[in-house]
C-alpha cells in the first residue's frame, strides 16, 4: 500500500498565491492533502470558482474524494491603511481608533475596519498587530471612535488584526460579508463551512438555520479562538452543537493566553472524539516551512502530538497559501503522521452517553474485532457517512474503507479519521464487491486477507446493525 492509504490523520491545506494553479493543486492532493481550505478573508469569487474547479478536476484525476472548506472571515477586525504602512508607538501613547477615518495622516488618529465604539467598554483590553501591541480602552470618544492607551513599545502596520478578548459581540459574529459569502457558497456546494470567533452554541444554531434556508448541506466547523468559547461548560455545548471543531491556536493564544493552548487543544480533541465530531488542529503546525525546506524539531513534535491525541485533521495555512515550499510541507507532514501512527498508540478518551446506543456499540465492536483478528481493513457501507463516523470515533489502527452512493458523503468523509471513501452504485453487496475489487488491485497486500464488513439495513443515518468477517480470496 502507498503512504497515502495508510495515513489515518488527514491533511487540510489552505490554497493561496503559492498554490494558485491547476498543477499546484494537483501536486498538493497527490502529496497527501485530503481537503482544501478556502480563506474568505482574501480573494474574489471569480478566483474561487477557478480554484474549486481545479480541486474537483484533480480529485477526479487522482480518483480520490477531496473535501472543500469555506472558512468565513467572521468579525475579524483590522486596522485600515496607515501612512507609510507603519506607525511607531510607545508606552503611554493615546491612540484614537475611528471607523469613519479613511485616509491616515500619520497621526495617532487611526482608521479601523469596524465600529469598536458599538461593542467595547472602558477598561477592556484591545490587542493590536495580532497581539504584539497591548492597549486598554480609556474612553468612548464618539459613536464611531474609541481612545486606547498603549501598554508596550513597538510598531503597528496596515491592515493587521485586532483582538478583543473581553468584548461581548452579543451574537453578532456573522458580518454582512459573511452572510453574502454564505449565500454565494451555497451555490458552490461546499462540504464544510467554518465559523470564526464562536462564543456560544447559539452562534452555530443560527448558522445552521441560515444554511438550511439556503438549501446547503455543508457541515459546520466551529473555530475555537475566544476566551469565552473555552469555558468548560460552554465548550462542551459548542462541541455538541457543531459538526466539528477547529482549534484555531493563533487567535486563541492572543485572546486567552498562549500557555492555555496545549491543554485546551487536548481537551477539545477528547470532547470531539467523545461526541463523534470532526476535530482539526490548526495554525503554524509547520510555520518555518514558509521559508525553509525542512520543518523544525518542535514542529514535527507538534504534528506528532496531534496525531497521538487522535485529531482527525492537521491543517496548513501560510505554509501552503504563501510559502516557498507548499508541496514539500505536505510531504513532511505526511511523513510525520505515518511514522507517528506506526510507532505510537492513539490516546484513549471517555465514551459519551450516546455510545450506549446499539449502533454505537456495534461500531465499537467492529473496531475491536478488526484489531483482535488483525484484519487488513474495516469496510463500511454508508449512505450518509454516519456508520463510518461512528467506527472512526474509536480510532482503529487500520483503514476504514467507506463505500457510499453519494459523492457529497464521500467528500465529507475525506477528512474523517482513517476513512478512505469510494463512490459506488447503491447495491446490497456494494461493500463486498469493493473489498474484492481492492483485493485484486493489491490494496490489502499479501494473502491471507481478512476484512470486517460493517453496514446497516435501516435507512436511518447511522443505524449500523450488521457486522461480518470476510476472508478475501
What role is predicted for each listed range?
Residues 1-473:
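Non-catalytic helical/linker scaffolds that mediate oligomerization, partner binding
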Amino acid at each position: 500500500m502507498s503512504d497515502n492509504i495508510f495515513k489515518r490523520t488527514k491533511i487540510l491545506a489552505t490554497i493561496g498565491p503559492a498554490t494558485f494553479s491547476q498543477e499546484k493543486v494537483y501536486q498538493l492532493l497527490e502529496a497527501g492533502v485530503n481537503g482544501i481550505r478556502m480563506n474568505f478573508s482574501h480573494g474574489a469569487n471569480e478566483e474561487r470558482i477557478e480554484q474549486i474547479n481545479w480541486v474537483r478536476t484533480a480529485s477526479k484525476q487522482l480518483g480520490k474524494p477531496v473535501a472543500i472548506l469555506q472558512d468565513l472571515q467572521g468579525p475579524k477586525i483590522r486596522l485600515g491603511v496607515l501612512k507609510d504602512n507603519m506607525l511607531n508607538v510607545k508606552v503611554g501613547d493615546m491612540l484614537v481608533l475611528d471607523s469613519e477615518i479613511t485616509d491616515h495622516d500619520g497621526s495617532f488618529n487611526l482608521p479601523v475596519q469596524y465600529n469598536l465604539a458599538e461593542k467595547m467598554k472602558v477598561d477592556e483590553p484591545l490587542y493590536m498587530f495580532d497581539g504584539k501591541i497591548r492597549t486598554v480602552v480609556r474612553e468612548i470618544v464618539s459613536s464611531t471612535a474609541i481612545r486606547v492607551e498603549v501598554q508596550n513599545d513597538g510598531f503597528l502596520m496596515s491592515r493587521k488584526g485586532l483582538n478583543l478578548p473581553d468584548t461581548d459581540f452579543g451574537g453578532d459574529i456573522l458580518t454582512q460579508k459573511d452572510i453574502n459569502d454564505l449565500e454565494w457558497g451555497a451555490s458552490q456546494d461546499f462540504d464544510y463551512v467554518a465559523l470564526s470567533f464562536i462564543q456560544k452554541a447559539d452562534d452555530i444554531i443560527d448558522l445552521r438555520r441560515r444554511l438550511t434556508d439556503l438549501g446547503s448541506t455543508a457541515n459546520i466547523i466551529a473555530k475555537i479562538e475566544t476566551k469565552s468559547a473555552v469555558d468548560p461548560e460552554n465548550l462542551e455545548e459548542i462541541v455538541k452543537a457543531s459538526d466539528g471543531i477547529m482549534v484555531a491556536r493563533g487567535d486563541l493564544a492572543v485572546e486567552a493566553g498562549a500557555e492555555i493552548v496545549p491543554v485546551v487543544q487536548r481537551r477539545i480533541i477528547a470532547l470531539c472524539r467523545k461526541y463523534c465530531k470532526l476535530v482539526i488542529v490548526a495554525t503554524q503546525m509547520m510555520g518555518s516551512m514558509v521559508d525553509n525546506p525542512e520543518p523544525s524539531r518542535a514542529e514535527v513534535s507538534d504534528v506528532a502530538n496531534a496525531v497521538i491525541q487522535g485529531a482527525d485533521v492537521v491543517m496548513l495555512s501560510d505554509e501552503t497559501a504563501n510559502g516557498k515550499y507548499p508541496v514539500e510541507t505536505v510531504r513532511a507532514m505526511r511523513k510525520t503522521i505515518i511514522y507517528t501512527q506506526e510507532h505510537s498508540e492513539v490516546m484513549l478518551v471517555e465514551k459519551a452517553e450516546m455510545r450506549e446506543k446499539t449502533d454505537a456499540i456495534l461500531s465499537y465492536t467492529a473496531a475491536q474485532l478488526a484489531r483482535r483478528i488483525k484484519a487488513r481493513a474495516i469496510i463500511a457501507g454508508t449512505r450518509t457517512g454516519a456508520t463510518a463516523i461512528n467506527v472512526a470515533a474509536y480510532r482503529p489502527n487500520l483503514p476504514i474503507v467507506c463505500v457510499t452512493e453519494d459523492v457529497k458523503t464521500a467528500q465529507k468523509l475525506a477528512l474523517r479519521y482513517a476513512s478512505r471513501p469510494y463512490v459506488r452504485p447503491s447495491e446490497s453487496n456494494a461493500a463486498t464487491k469493493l473489498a474484492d475489487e481492492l483485493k485484486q488491485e493489491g490494496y490489502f497486500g499479501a494473502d491471507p486477507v481478512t476484512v470486517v464488513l460493517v453496514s446497516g439495513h435501516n435507512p436511518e443515518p447511522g443505524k449500523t446493525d450488521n457486522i461480518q468477517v470476510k476472508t478475501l480470496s
